[in-house]
Amino acid sequence: MSLSIIFMGTPEFSVPTLRLLVDAGHRIVAVYTQPPRPGGRRGLDLQKSPVHQAAELLGLPVFTPVNFKDPEERERFAALKADVAVVVAYGLLLPEAVLNGTRDGCYNGHASLLPRWRGAAPIQRAIMAGDAETGMMVMKMDKGLDTGAVALTRKVEIGPNMTAGELHDRLMQVGAKAMAEAMVKLEMNDLPLTPQPQDGVLYAAKIDKAETRIDFARPALDVHNHIRGLAPFPGAWFELEIGGKPERVKVLGSELAEGQGAAGELLTDDLVVACASGAVRLTRLQKAGGKPLAAADFLRGTPLAAGMRLS
């Protein structure tokens, strides 16, 4: 036996779930993903989403509505007569007509331990807040923002130096397995739902460019969490005066270090920077238009000395 599934997702994070559902023998009757976006060096080429590309390689039908406001779009969804819809980082709001448009509703894979970090950026926010643990949850969607009842939980430890990129890749695989397991249980009519707690609700707002600059006038642990929570994208950054003009440098890796000094002061020649309390060592950096480099390689091209100030 197998389920007939509508899959809804867009980025790379969603692809392993789609592939695992196909490998499990489920019938994917349609794949919904966001429309192609301008891309390429000049933004002239329309680029299909990772899910769109994966679906085409799997020979699956793909739909790319801008939204579900058009009644015909909602009718097309319902006409698929699927058992269930699986939603993983789709990126579009689903009206009630879609949420209720399959036999068993819509199940979402969300990258946090709900109700903590509902919303758009749960991976980054968990690290930026210094959380030691997160996870993947499969929930049955309702009309609220990540408020649905929970069907399955898989916890994941966040290492002290783990970046958002590393956690993304770990949760991507954990989430795929969790959703595949949930669909087996759903098919067996053995997927009980538990309402989310009323306490502990936090919202993971989308990352704003204005918050990406590093503030070395914060404690070292906060600076370290800020850096790794934004690595590799969009990247936390500081400004450095090179050749008489300020240049933006992204920091893609850091670790806590010993030392005290004025906030932003380079304490050593190997990129230990003083914070409000304590210090951080910058381990991976990237200048505008350049490649990410380990600290030693970065210093070969951009000599920095103790006593300089980063801002």
Curated annotation (Swiss-Prot):
Q: Could you name the domain of life of the organism this protein comes from?
A: Bacteria
Q: Which UniProt keywords apply?
A: Protein biosynthesis, Transferase
Which residues are recorded as binding (6S)-5,6,7,8-tetrahydrofolate? 112-115
Q: What class of enzyme is it?
A: transferase
| GO molecular function list | methionyl-tRNA formyltransferase activity
| Cellular-component GO terms for this entry | cytosol
Query: Which InterPro entries does the UniProt record give?
Result: Fmt, Formyl_trans_C, Formyl_transf_N, Formyl_transf_N_sf, Formyl_transferase-like_C_sf, GART_AS, Met-tRNA-FMT_C, Met-tRNA-FMT_N
Could you list the residue ranges that cross the membrane?
none
Q: Write down the chemical reaction(s) this protein catalyses.
A: L-methionyl-tRNA(fMet) + (6R)-10-formyltetrahydrofolate = N-formyl-L-methionyl-tRNA(fMet) + (6S)-5,6,7,8-tetrahydrofolate + H(+)
Q: What is its EC number?
A: 2.1.2.9
Question: What is its biological role?
Answer: Attaches a formyl group to the free amino group of methionyl-tRNA(fMet). The formyl group appears to play a dual role in the initiator identity of N-formylmethionyl-tRNA by promoting its recognition by IF2 and preventing the misappropriation of this tRNA by the elongation apparatus.
In terms of HAMAP family, this protein maps to:
Formyl_trans
- State the NCBIfam families in the record: fmt (TIGR00460)
Tell me which family the UniProt entry assigns to this protein: Belongs to the Fmt family.
Full protein name: Methionyl-tRNA formyltransferase
Q: Which organism is it from?
A: Rhizobium leguminosarum bv. trifolii (strain WSM2304)
What is the taxonomic lineage of the source species?
Bacteria, Pseudomonadati, Pseudomonadota, Alphaproteobacteria, Hyphomicrobiales
Q: Which gene encodes it?
A: fmt
